[in-house]
């Protein structure tokens, strides 16, 4: 992939950009083999990759500069701003949004936040696009509610310029720290969730719910999990750290009992909406801590699917799963190092199948799906 920002030395986020996609896949595969060394793997499935550019469905832009000439991108450690509007990871559909937002910021009087001076209001712009219908969600991350009235008054102009903006919010992040969002979300549109669809499964994206940033590869990840579960005798399943329900909604059948657990209420609202659309009445999604939920249960499902954050599921949940001993565990991980550590805490399971998904091209990161079977 060619990137003018990288060539000019202005951005180094894609550290592997000089390697071919095949070289990147080989290096990631070797890393996964190294991490699972000593753990017998029955089947290594071929890695899955997607487009090398224009694949991201989300932009997270630091706003700097002035209200008349805002700049969207990032700040170097010395405070130097870098404009990332031309980043080749973004689809072409993002460019007109960025172009319209620059004069809009002046119209709304949203002074960019100055980190050094601790002054200003607009900290970040968070833009998400649905691959299903091209609809977009835009979040203005503000220091306070001071400019809300002005923002609301200026919105009709922006929506006339960009009718694809279906969900618009103001997120309030008052602290002087590099934190992307605060707890308060104020909706500026009637619509509160963005419609998405993977493999004919309806999914919803809300402002404070996690959603994969590479929809092409994510849809193949969910489809693969569905295929694996479909080959197993599963009537009762847990989907832990379930997010908006992507895995569970793909794997569920009308006859299957499935419980999805995720700590974020916004994500659970999305999952419940999807389950209702699919007419799956035996799916139950709850906003709880996954480890606390699992360790409080007295029943044992046939399969437990886990999709934890980078820290992994941790030893307490590993110990409980080892004791509870479901017949199957599917582990989806964005950090193979912590996944390998967790699997070593499950000595009564063998690895039947492993597949790497190149969710993050041009970086060392990748997603991996692993099927564990009880000995």
Curated annotation (Swiss-Prot):
UniProt EC number: 2.1.1.189
Cystine bridges:
none
Residues engaged in binding S-adenosyl-L-methionine: 212, 241, 262, 307
**CDD domains assigned:** AdoMet_MTases (cd02440)
Q: What is the top-level taxon of the source organism? A: Bacteria
Q: Which UniProt keywords apply?
A: 4Fe-4S, Iron, Iron-sulfur, Metal-binding, Methyltransferase, rRNA processing, S-adenosyl-L-methionine, Transferase
Active site location: 334
Pfam families in the record? tRNA_U5-meth_tr
Spans through the membrane: none
Q: Give the catalysed reaction(s), semicolon-separated.
A: uridine(747) in 23S rRNA + S-adenosyl-L-methionine = 5-methyluridine(747) in 23S rRNA + S-adenosyl-L-homocysteine + H(+)
GO MF terms listed in the record are: 4 iron, 4 sulfur cluster binding; iron ion binding; rRNA (uridine-C5-)-methyltransferase activity
Which BP terms in the Gene Ontology apply to this protein?
rRNA base methylation
Q: Which residues bind [4Fe-4S] cluster?
A: 3, 11, 14, 87
List the InterPro entries. Answer: 23SrRNA_MeTrfase_RlmC, MeTrfase_TrmA_AS, MeTrfase_TrmA_CS, SAM-dependent_MTases_sf, U5_MeTrfase_fam
What the protein does?
Answer: Catalyzes the formation of 5-methyl-uridine at position 747 (m5U747) in 23S rRNA.
Protein family: Belongs to the class I-like SAM-binding methyltransferase superfamily. RNA M5U methyltransferase family. RlmC subfamily.
Protein name, please?
Answer: 23S rRNA (uracil(747)-C(5))-methyltransferase RlmC
Annotated source species = Salmonella typhi
| Taxonomic lineage from the root | Bacteria, Pseudomonadati, Pseudomonadota, Gammaproteobacteria, Enterobacterales
């Amino acid at each position: 992939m060619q990137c003018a920002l990288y060539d000019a030395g202005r951005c180094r986020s894609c550290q592997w950009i000089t390697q071919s996609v095949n070289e990147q896949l080989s290096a990631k595969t070797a890393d996964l083999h190294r991490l699972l060394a000593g753990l017998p793997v029955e089947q290594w499935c071929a890695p899955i990759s997607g487009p090398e550019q224009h694949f991201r469905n989300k932009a997270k832009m630091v706003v700097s500069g002035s209200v008349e000439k805002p700049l969207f991108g990032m700040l170097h450690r010395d405070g130097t701003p870098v404009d990332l509007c031309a980043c080749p990871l973004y689809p072409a559909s993002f460019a007109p949004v960025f172009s319209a937002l620059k004069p809009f910021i002046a119209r709304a009087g949203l002074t960019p936040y100055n980190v050094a001076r601790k002054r200003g209001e607009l900290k970040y712009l968070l833009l998400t696009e649905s691959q299903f219908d091209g609809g977009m969600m835009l979040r203005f991350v503000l220091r306070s509610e001071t400019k809300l009235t002005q923002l609301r008054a200026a919105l009709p102009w922006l929506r006339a310029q960009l009718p694809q903006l279906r969900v618009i919010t103001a997120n309030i992040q008052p602290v002087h720290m590099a934190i992307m969002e605060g707890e308060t979300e104020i909706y500026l549109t009637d619509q509160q969730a963005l419609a998405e669809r993977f493999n004919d499964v309806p999914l919803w994206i809300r402002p404070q719910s996690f959603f994969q940033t590479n929809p092409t590869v994510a849809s193949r990840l969910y489809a693969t999990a569905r295929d694996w579960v479909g080959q197993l005798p599963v009537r009762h399943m847990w989907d832990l750290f379930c997010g908006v329900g992507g895995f569970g909604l793909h794997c569920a059948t009308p006859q299957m009992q499935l419980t999805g657990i995720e700590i974020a209420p916004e994500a659970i609202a999305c999952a419940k909406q999807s389950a209702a659309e699919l007419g799956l009445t035996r799916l139950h999604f709850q906003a709880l801590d996954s480890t606390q939920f699992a360790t409080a249960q007295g029943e044992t499902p046939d399969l437990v699917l886990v999709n934890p954050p980078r820290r992994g599921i941790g030893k307490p949940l590993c110990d409980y799963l080892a004791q509870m001993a479901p017949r199957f565990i599917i582990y989806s991980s964005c950090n193979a190092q912590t996944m390998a550590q967790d699997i070593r805490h499950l000595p009564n399971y063998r690895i039947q199948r492993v597949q790497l998904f190149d969710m993050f091209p041009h970086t060392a990161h990748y997603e991996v799906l692993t099927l564990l079977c009880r000995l």
